[in-house]
Structures are given as C-alpha cells and as structure tokens.
Regions:
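Hydrophobic membrane-insertion alpha-helices, especially the h-region
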Residues: 1-13
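Active-site rim/loop-helix segments in enzyme catalytic domains that contact anionic ligands
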Residues: 12-136, 163-164
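Short, solvent-exposed loop/turn segments at secondary-structure junctions
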Residues: 81, 109-110, 147-149, 182-183
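Proline-aspartate-enriched helix->loop->beta-strand connector
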Residues: 133, 137-147
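Short, well-ordered beta-to-alpha junction loops that form the rim of enzyme active sites
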Residues: 143-147, 153, 180
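Short Gly/Thr/Asp-enriched flexible loops that form oxyanion-binding sites at enzyme active sites
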Residues: 150-165
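Short, flexible loop segments at boundaries between secondary-structure elements
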Residues: 167-184
Length: 184
C-alpha cells in the first residue's frame, strides 16, 4: 500500500510497507531544490537496525552486499532510481526478503540517455548522506569501494561521498567497502 505523507518542495515522500511491516521510504525530487524530508522518517522505525548500506543503484545492494543483507538488520540507502517503477519494485522485493529497511533517493542515474555526473546535485547528495549518518548510531557502514568495483563513476562517487561523511563524523573504524569488505 502506498501512503502519501507529504509534498515537499519539488517532490514527495511516500512509504511502501510490506507484510513484514518493514518499509521502503522514497524521496521523489529533482536536484534543483533541497529536500529536507529525511526527518519525516519516524525515529522508532530504525530501532534494532545498526547497520547501514549506501549504494548508488538498486541491485548494487544485492550484487555487492547480498550475503550481508541476509545476515543482519540493514538500512539500505539507494541514491538513484526512485523514479523508476521497475527498479523500485525490485528494490522493495530485496528489502522485504532480507528484513531490511530501504531508503531510496531519486538522484539521476541518466539524463537524456547519458550517465549523469551528479554535478548539479552533489551538494544535495552530500547533505542527504550526512543526514542519514546522523539518524542512528550505526555500528557498521558499508558502501562501494573507492575504485567503484569495476570503475563505475556513480560507485566511485558514492564511495567518496560516504567516506567523507563518515570521516567527518570520526567513524572510519565502522566503514567497510564492497569487494573484499576491506576495513577502511
């Protein structure tokens, strides 16, 4: 069931719940306006979740961190594709099957058929990642490795943005990267 919570600036926030009573939170916006909607997630939603995974695209959580999702209560943040219905359904399915909580942002993956470089929204992504890090006392924070696994620019940028935000919070001892899950 979809519940519309608020129309916020250039977008909307809504929640899709599943039979496990876990949720996927969506933030629909474009990069031209600041979206302070993360504060609308009820604080008790994160109770019992101390692991955070930040990925660039839906399916990255499965490809690079799937076995970890099966073994822990993760909050999975996906930076792109909140506006793509198929990718949303796939993400919801993974979240449901693993008992995780999902937060899907809607920063662009592609514009006019070309990979977006996030220049127009990098500051907004940085602010959203910082806000998510402040939402809980994360014991484990997982993201793409600095090389972007196979050189994908969004994976590299997600790694850089997450690493910087974690460093700013002096929590590098909690940061792990995909690949070999090398401790940062």
């Amino acid at each position: 069931c979809l519940v519309l919570f608020a129309a916020l600036f250039c977008g909307a926030l809504y929640c899709s719940t599943n039979s496990n009573e876990k949720a996927v939170w969506y933030f629909s916006s474009n990069c031209e306006g600041k979206l302070n909607s993360l504060s609308h997630i009820p604080k008790n939603t994160l109770t019992g979740y101390d692991s955070l995974m930040i990925v660039a695209h839906p399916d990255d959580e499965t490809i690079w961190g799937g076995s970890h999702l099966l073994n822990g209560n993760y909050v999975v943040v996906c930076i792109t594709n909140g506006n793509n219905k198929t990718r949303r359904r796939e993400f919801e399915s993974v979240i449901k099957q693993t008992g995780s909580i999902g937060i899907m942002l809607t920063y662009p993956d592609k514009r006019l058929g070309k990979r977006d470089n996030w220049n127009s929204c990098k500051t907004e992504i940085e602010k959203d990642v910082a806000a998510i890090l402040k939402m809980n006392d994360w014991q484990t924070i997982v993201t793409h490795n600095p090389e972007g696994e196979y050189g994908h620019i969004h994976h590299q940028m997600t790694s850089e943005l997450t690493t910087t935000a974690v460093s700013d919070r002096e929590q590098l001892d909690r940061l792990y990267y995909f690949g070999k899950y090398v401790k940062a």
